Amino acid sequence: MTIANPSPSNFFQQLGRQCLKTLADLRLAIALLLLIAVFSISGTVIEQGESLSFYQQNYPEDPALFGFLSWQVILQLGLNQVYRTWWFLGLLILFGSSLTACTFNRQFPALKAARSWQFYHQPRQFKKLALSFSLPDGDINKIESLLRDRGYKIFQEGDSVYARKGLMGKVGPIIVHGAMLIILGGAIWGALTGFFAQHMIPSGETFQVSNIIEKGPLADSQIPKDWGIKVNRFWINYTENGAIDQFYSDLSVVNNQGEELDRQTISVNHPLRHRGVTFYQTNWGIAGVKVQLNNSPVLQLPMAPLQTANGGQLWGAYIPTKTDFSEGAALLVKDLQGTMIIYDQEGNLTDAVRAGSTVEINGVNITIKELVGSTGLQIKADPGIPFVYLGFGLLMVGVMMSYVSHSQVWLLSVDGDGQREIYLGGRTNRAQVAFEREILAIAEEAEVSSKTEAKVNA
């Protein structure tokens, strides 16, 4: 007696079927979805794409947040850029594979079964239906007509009739799965090909996107190289009590020859979009101050950000009154409204001035021309967003379709004891009470019609 060893092809076929069965397991899909949700929440709670010093300051080793979450753990696990890590993308791919396997293993067979014609040829077959009864002297043609009036599609084979409606209720889950696959694909594509950058640019300057904070491995083609942005002007609107109402940037898209391709004024929540790259207004600052010393040309002096003891923000500049910088004055400003404070070399308050004012310090007339604001821009490109929007649109359509009841009705006409008896039964996958009322109404209407015809014939 010999024992036949399984061939390698059979082994791999069995292994493939087992893997497919595991992937199609609903429990695996739910577990993956929960993991994706947990890590997505962590990416929302933990600031993404910040500098090393930021994480060291906000997530120290001692004491670590929750006893374990320090800056080292965040960087080692990639929690500072969750959505671009290999393990998060791997979870998305695995979840997509599970959805695909479930679609082909469960949803398509269910749709195929729903589309097939299932005729009952024996009265005993109606006993397995939760809703079934018989109509003595019933008219099968009348019942067919009543079903057709209610949107049922009729199929007939001899004395047996099969009717169905709501087939889109079986198509809905397939569309839902397909929509989720499109969303996952868009998220993965965006992570691979998108980038995120930040710039602080003074008014009048032109720049090209270069300060990349995050980018995917395939993002180089998305980063603009043949065009840049010119900041024509930056300004802030203030409320009556001096609080910031909104800040604006007048931006021009220019090519490498300086020609303007597009122009738009942006503000918070109103970005500029050009060739798949979006420029958001997110911050502001004061880049410099233009001054004139006596009759000298107008000079633009840089201003540095300063933190006050109570956490406030100021900007300061040193205005030299001698060519060797041995004497001068300090200028401090809080915002772009124009009020500036000047201190002399000893730190004494000299004057509070506005743009256009002149003050004398160390025998030098200092004329304050204007403050130069700088705009803070966030620059993002995510080619996967259109796919995500498309997926969510299809998802809503699929969910609504899934709520359509798939209802099935069987009829069988049987001759016996000198009279014709109609067996009627049906089932549905949802809205059971409404379905029962519908079938009972059809039965009552058919019965009344049969009695009326019998009286007329008599």
UniProtKB/Swiss-Prot annotation:
Superkingdom field: Bacteria
Lumenal, thylakoid topological domain residue ranges: 47-84, 192-458
Cellular localization per UniProt: Cellular thylakoid membrane
Membrane-topology descriptor: Multi-pass membrane protein
Record has Ubl conjugation as a keyword: no
Pfam family, one: ResB
Range of residues in the leader sequence: none
Major site of localization recorded for this protein: membrane
One biological process term in Gene Ontology: cytochrome complex assembly
Keywords (A to Z) from UniProt: Cytochrome c-type biogenesis, Membrane, Thylakoid, Transmembrane, Transmembrane helix
Transmembrane residue ranges: 26-46, 85-105, 171-191
Segments in the Cytoplasmic topological domain: 1-25, 106-170
A Gene Ontology cellular-component term: plasma membrane-derived thylakoid membrane
Disruption phenotype: Bacteria lacking the N-terminus of CcsB are able to grow anaerobically but not aerobically, suggesting its function is essential for aerobic growth. In these bacteria reduced amounts of some holo-c-type cytochromes are observed (cytochrome f and cytochrome c550); unprocessed precursor apocytochrome f accumulates but is not thought to be integrated into the cytochrome b6-f complex. Holo-cytochrome c553 (also known as cytochrome c6) does not accumulate however.
Entry's family note: Belongs to the Ccs1/CcsB family.
Subunit structure: May interact with CcsA.
Function in brief: Required during biogenesis of c-type cytochromes (cytochrome c6 and cytochrome f) at the step of heme attachment.
PANTHER family, alphabetized: CYTOCHROME C BIOGENESIS PROTEIN CCS1, CHLOROPLASTIC
HAMAP family assigned to the protein according to its UniProt record, in alphabetical order: CytC_Ccs1
Protein name, per record: Cytochrome c biogenesis protein CcsB
Organism: Synechocystis sp. (strain ATCC 27184 / PCC 6803 / Kazusa)
Taxon lineage: Bacteria, Bacillati, Cyanobacteriota, Cyanophyceae, Synechococcales
